[in-house]
């Protein structure tokens, strides 16, 4: 175990939209350290999202992310030999990273199209409140709702 909590690293905003959120998405999409390739994929996807939604790319992107961010999640806790799934509120930074992770995972799971197109389609679905990433969020919320009876075990 650590003596102290690890310090959060500052993420530099991206050069085009000047936004930290876009940089985080680029870092999530990046494979094997190929950042320039990841940047191309993300910027193309944001353009496609903007065209489809008829909104500025950052507005549409932020709405899509907010539609995927979970508010609650469950964590296992052992109480007297039984393991209960206990609902916890999700901190803002974790909610954001989970949302990005789910969107990228859902985009990668699609097949038969270029990655930028798959990412754009998943972002459009998230913007509209549909899609795999939004379904994942609803599943997590459903599990939290089911474990509501054990919420008093939080400590």
Curated annotation (Swiss-Prot):
Any Pfam family matching the protein: Ribosomal_S7
Keywords: Ribonucleoprotein, Ribosomal protein, RNA-binding, rRNA-binding, tRNA-binding
InterPro entries per the UniProt record, alphabetical: Ribosomal_uS7, Ribosomal_uS7_bac/org-type, Ribosomal_uS7_CS, Ribosomal_uS7_dom, Ribosomal_uS7_dom_sf
One MF term in the entry's GO annotations: tRNA binding
Keyword Coiled coil belongs to the record: no
Coiled coil: none
Any single GO BP term: translation
Any GO CC annotation of this UniProt entry: small ribosomal subunit
Oligomer status and interactors: Part of the 30S ribosomal subunit. Contacts proteins S9 and S11.
Function: One of the primary rRNA binding proteins, it binds directly to 16S rRNA where it nucleates assembly of the head domain of the 30S subunit. Is located at the subunit interface close to the decoding center, probably blocks exit of the E-site tRNA.
Family to which this protein belongs: Belongs to the universal ribosomal protein uS7 family.
Name listed for the protein in its UniProt record: Small ribosomal subunit protein uS7
Originating species: Kosmotoga olearia (strain ATCC BAA-1733 / DSM 21960 / TBF 19.5.1)
């Amino acid at each position: 175990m650590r003596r102290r909590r690890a310090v959060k690293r500052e993420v530099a905003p991206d050069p085009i939209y000047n936004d930290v959120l876009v940089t985080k998405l680029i870092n999530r999409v990046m494979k094997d350290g190929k950042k320039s390739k990841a940047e191309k994929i993300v910027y193309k996807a944001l353009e496609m999202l903007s065209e489809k939604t008829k909104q500025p790319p950052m507005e549409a992107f932020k709405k899509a992310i907010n539609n995927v961010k979970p508010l609650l999640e469950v964590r296992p806790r052992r109480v007297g030999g039984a393991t209960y799934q206990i609902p916890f509120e999700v901190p803002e930074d974790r909610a954001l990273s989970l949302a990005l992770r789910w969107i990228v995972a859902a985009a990668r799971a699609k097949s038969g199209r270029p990655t930028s197109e798959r990412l754009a389609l998943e972002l459009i679905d998230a913007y509209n409140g549909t899609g795999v990433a939004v379904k994942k969020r609803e599943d997590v919320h459903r599990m939290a709702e089911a474990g509501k009876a054990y919420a008093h075990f939080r400590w």
